[in-house]
């Protein structure tokens, strides 16, 4: 059975620029049960945007969406990121971007929350990993 992050609390997140990874550290807390620790790791990150951090965020899902759908929904925002900082370079031409992203194995992911932090990432992979309890 695949790990779920639905209703997990976001404890922290880390953006590692040089490695191009983002790690979301989450916990699933239920009274009278052991806390489940799960990390969501985006690898090969090309671009991302998170917003609405409530410092008590509850994740709903992190979903992979088709590139065309992703660019239809977030293309204007990605174009603005490119205008401001020149990255990601493929955003200079959003018409040819879907083909480039597919060729490079890059996908769009949408992070949705029941409360707080939401946003998106453009990355090669997402992994949902169990973690031993922190010491």
Model-inferred region functions:
Residues 1-135:
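Surface-exposed, interaction-prone regions used to assemble/regulate multi-protein complexes
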């Amino acid at each position: 059975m695949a790990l779920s992050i639905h209703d997990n609390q976001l404890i922290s997140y880390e953006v590692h620029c040089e490695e191009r990874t983002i790690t979301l550290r989450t916990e699933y807390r239920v009274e009278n049960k052991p806390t489940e620790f799960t990390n969501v790791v985006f690898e090969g990150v090309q671009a991302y945007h998170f917003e609405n951090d409530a410092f008590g965020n509850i994740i709903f899902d992190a979903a992979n969406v088709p590139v065309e759908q992703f660019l239809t929904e977030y293309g204007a925002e990605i174009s603005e990121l490119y205008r401001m900082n020149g990255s990601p370079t493929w955003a200079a031409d959003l018409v040819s971007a879907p083909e480039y992203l597919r060729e490079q194995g890059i996908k769009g992911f949408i992070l949705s929350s029941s409360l707080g932090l939401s946003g998106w990432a453009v990355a090669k992979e997402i992994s949902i990993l169990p973690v031993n309890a922190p010491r």
